[in-house]
Amino acid sequence: MFALRTAARPAARSVGATRNYATLREIEMRLKSIKNIEKITNTMKIVASTKLGKAQRAMATSKVYNEASEKVFENSETAVPENIEKRLWVVVSSDKGLCGSIHSQLARTVRRKLLDFESGEKLIDIVAVGEKIKAQLGRSNPEQMRLSFGGTGKEAPTFEEAAHIADEILALDTQYDDIEIVYNKVLSGISFEPIMKESYSAKAIEDAPKFGQYELEDDVVKNLADFSLANTIYAAMAEGHAAEISARRNAMDNASKNASDMINKYSILYNRTRQAVITNELVDIITGASSLE
């Protein structure tokens, strides 16, 4: 009977030891996975930090042209027409993710403003620049989507890209009384805000009080309106790109910090579990030695 009891104890201890070893392996695998994630997020943060300088320089360059254009319209007292029949919003985003809530916040702002502006059967048409905003607004407002453009966000935008988008918009069969650009404006290194910027139509320029003092040819007014649209889109794309890169850097920085915290917690848990395994093994050895005495 004594022999049966001593034989049963090692079997029970063996099950406990096996469970501890299995837990230890699980923790070790989880720890390895989190460390790999931390390496990836750290690398992405470094890449974003490197790209941010180029994006900020592109934003500064675009602002120089855009501010000069805005000054012309400000001095000429150009204003939005009072009776607007057709509106178009050009929503500027990009194709890339892993940058926090920057795309979803822009989409929420557009949806909210659409509810504020629309009345009756009149719908505001939308042009989506970037696959992210196209996907979000395409699900909620598919009937308002007129055009969409992909391939944005990989590099700092250029005026040629903005001019191509403007040409496609102007080639639409609808004559819009008002065109506004919706994009993310950089407030600081860690914050941004979706805003709307006006792009004046040829009619708005013709009706401006101080432009009316000059005899301008129709081609001049049209070219000025077309250039203004391309210029405004370019400025929005450049600033939106800088906001996105900054948001991605911050998101990857937060992810790296969270991964580091998890690594510390799992390291402590791993060491405690390992210590428990060693302690159990020592208990088994001592118990076995005592039973042989």
Curated annotation (Swiss-Prot):
Keyword Transport: yes
One cellular-component annotation, GO: mitochondrial inner membrane
Record membrane topology: Peripheral membrane protein
Keyword annotations of the record: ATP synthesis, CF(1), Hydrogen ion transport, Ion transport, Membrane, Mitochondrion, Mitochondrion inner membrane, Transit peptide, Transport
One biological process term in Gene Ontology: proton motive force-driven ATP synthesis
Entry keyword Cytoplasm: no
Annotated family: Belongs to the ATPase gamma chain family.
Quaternary structure annotation from Swiss-Prot or TrEMBL: F-type ATP synthases have 2 components, the catalytic core F(1) and the membrane-embedded component F(0), linked together by a central stalk and a peripheral stalk. The central stalk, also called rotor shaft, is often seen as part of F(1). The peripheral stalk is seen as part of F(0). F(0) contains the membrane channel next to the rotor. F-type ATP synthases form dimers but each monomer functions independently in ATP generation.
Protein name: ATP synthase subunit gamma, mitochondrial
Organism: Yarrowia lipolytica (strain CLIB 122 / E 150) (Yeast)
Lineage: Eukaryota, Fungi, Dikarya, Ascomycota, Saccharomycotina
